[in-house]
Amino acid sequence: MSKVADALKLMKDEEVEYVDIRFTDPRGKLQHVTLVADLVDEDFFEEGFMFDGSSIAGWKSIDQSDMKLIPDAGSVYIDPFYAEKTLCVHCNVVEPDTGEAYSRDPRGAAVKAEAYLKASGIGDVAYFGPEAEFFIFDDVRYSVTPAKVAYQIDADAGAWNTDSEYEMGNLAHRAGHKGGYFPVNPIDEAQDLRGEMLSTMKRMGMKVDKHHHEVATCQHELGLIFGGLTEQADNILKYKYVIHNVAGMHGKTVTFMPKPMKGDNGSGMHVNMSIWKEQALFAGDKYADLSQEALWFIGGILKQPSVNALTNPATNSYKRLIPGFEAPVLRAYSARNRSGCVRIPWTESPNAKRVEARFPDPSANPYLAFAALLMAGLDGIKNKIDPGPASDKDLYDLPPEELAAIPTVCGSLREALEELEKDHDFLLAGDVFTKDQLEGYMALKWEEVYAYEHTPHPVEYQMYYSC
């Protein structure tokens, strides 16, 4: 049975009332439109749905606004939150007059990256295993006006609430700053909430394996089992969707901001990657039982600081990428060592041999981030880029002279965009990314840089008001 036939059968079996077609904007925010299920038949999956592309930031001008969404029948699932039974499906964006993929469609770049891998002859499939962290709060307020620039967060579980007064008393069990990794409840107060999130994902057909409290106060992570590049990018969007909505049902609010508060660890999105061509391409007899291709793949990722513009695309990303908070700052690699940008997780099975990029964060558009990482790695294999010797020391404690010899990740979104402007040819291979797409993306991100740089910050009042 075809994927379209499977989707239509699911609609019938589940007595679906509506079909929610979904796609992402360049920043990675999920967008949707809901159709009456009676309008969705076999032809719909081929002909798609017209929409106004000029209303999506960074896409079409109003005089060329018509765009078309083509549903991917292999991506369907039943929405767990809507009151009426609704089938959801992820879409690719195409030009209505030619039927060709729209050059700025993020999902289209992911699909093309997978096709490019196969066409290159290097591998048949790339597997991705992202690990996205997040914070759960009870109350978040912020203001950005000429007279007030401020934010305030609160959570009963927050380490700062040890002396707060509560109507039923302060029970005092909390994860302290940098003290949240793995204690049981009552310190881990979100056990049941995370369990509900994970169970919801299972009911949607997602492959999951675990959940736990993370290092920072109020910080958490759920585990996704690895899958194909586009599939896992879809899953990260579903992951965020479920977490936001389950938290909201319990009066909580979630953020995937990389660094929502000072003085504690930020949220990363570590990305595990492997390539298969009949067998695991990364298993071998080199360092850490890696193959030569795996080392070149690492070399490609470490060579390209411009990747940061796609894997760490927020001004806030670079408040996480600083020493002292378990975030990778140095462009180095090691087996098991978590202080470098790339880690080789220990495993007994050659089939599980993989590399882990530790610098990405969950503010990234997963389609663009995963495609960029794959393209950088493939560029490393094609050009046999040597990653240099592994760094098996604690990179956080290196003496200054050794530290100075190791290149770093970008220090700001401005720097990352400048690197991307200078060096992006590896992304253009196979037309996976296009110049038009990168230019549109960078224009949006430069707007964010200017907004951030031109807004006075409260700490500037603390440091300079009395000058």
From Swiss-Prot:
Per UniProt, Mg(2+) 2 binds at: 133, 214, 221
Primary localisation category: cytoplasm
Q: Binding of ATP: at which residues?
A: 209, 272-274, 338, 343
Q: What is its EC number?
A: 6.3.1.2
| Residues bound to Mg(2+) 1 | 131, 270, 356
Q: Which GO BP annotation is one of this protein's?
A: nitrogen utilization
Q: How is the cofactor bound?
A: Binds 2 Mg(2+) ions per subunit.
One MF annotation (Gene Ontology) recorded for this entry: ATP binding
Q: Which residues carry this modification: O-AMP-tyrosine?
A: 396
Say which domain of life the source belongs to. Answer: Bacteria
Entry's SUPFAM superfamilies? Glutamine synthetase, N-terminal domain, Glutamine synthetase/guanido kinase
Provide the reaction this enzyme catalyses.
L-glutamate + NH4(+) + ATP = L-glutamine + ADP + phosphate + H(+)
* Record's subcellular location: Cytoplasm
- In what way is its activity controlled? The activity of this enzyme could be controlled by adenylation under conditions of abundant glutamine.
What keyword terms does UniProt attach to this protein? ATP-binding, Cytoplasm, Ligase, Magnesium, Metal-binding, Nitrogen fixation, Nucleotide-binding, Phosphoprotein
Give start and end of each GS catalytic domain.
106-467
Q: Subunit notes for this chain? A: Oligomer of 12 subunits arranged in the form of two hexameric ring.
Q: Which family does it belong to?
A: Belongs to the glutamine synthetase family.
Please describe what this protein does. Catalyzes the ATP-dependent biosynthesis of glutamine from glutamate and ammonia.
The protein's name: Glutamine synthetase
What is the organism of origin for this protein? Cereibacter sphaeroides (Rhodobacter sphaeroides)
